[in-house]
């Protein structure tokens, strides 16, 4: 995009508290409870979301740490306006005692008013998550 005087960067981040674990429950959104720095986006920890204020191409990243208590697995998907983006997912699984980070970054064309969240689409066994983050940066 354009740079120079008068061009403000557009970005936003929302995270969860470090070390606070949440149970992975099917068809719920990841709990993002701490608003981070933002400019040109709306951060809402009450509904675990980032809203896009300016149409454009964005780098969208999410990262979540899972702690597997028993043989378990989980699938996460980005949602846009509560619509699951099946092509944008991460998977994690394994035996008891495994800690795994589930993360990805995508470039997406987003519209003003789009609301982004991360949803737990599948979860089996005993699995908890923590240290979650969702970050958007407008690149064009």
PLM segments and residue spans:
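Extracellular jelly-roll beta-sandwich "head" domains, especially the C-terminal globular C1q domain
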Residues: 2-140
């Amino acid at each position: 995009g354009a740079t120079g005087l008068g061009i403000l960067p557009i970005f936003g981040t929302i995270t969860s508290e470090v070390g606070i674990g949440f149970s992975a429950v099917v068809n719920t959104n990841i709990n993002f409870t701490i608003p981070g720095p933002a400019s040109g986006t709306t951060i809402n920890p009450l509904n675990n979301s980032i809203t896009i204020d300016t149409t454009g191409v964005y780098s969208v990243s999410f990262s979540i740490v899972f702690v597997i208590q028993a043989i378990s697995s989980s699938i996460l998907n980005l949602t846009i306006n509560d619509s699951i983006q099946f092509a944008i997912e991460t998977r994690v699984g394994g035996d008891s005692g495994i800690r795994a980070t589930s993360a990805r970054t995508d470039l997406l064309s987003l519209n003003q008013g789009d609301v982004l969240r991360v949803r737990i689409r599948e979860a089996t066994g005993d699995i908890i998550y923590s240290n979650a983050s969702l970050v958007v940066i407008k690149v064009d």
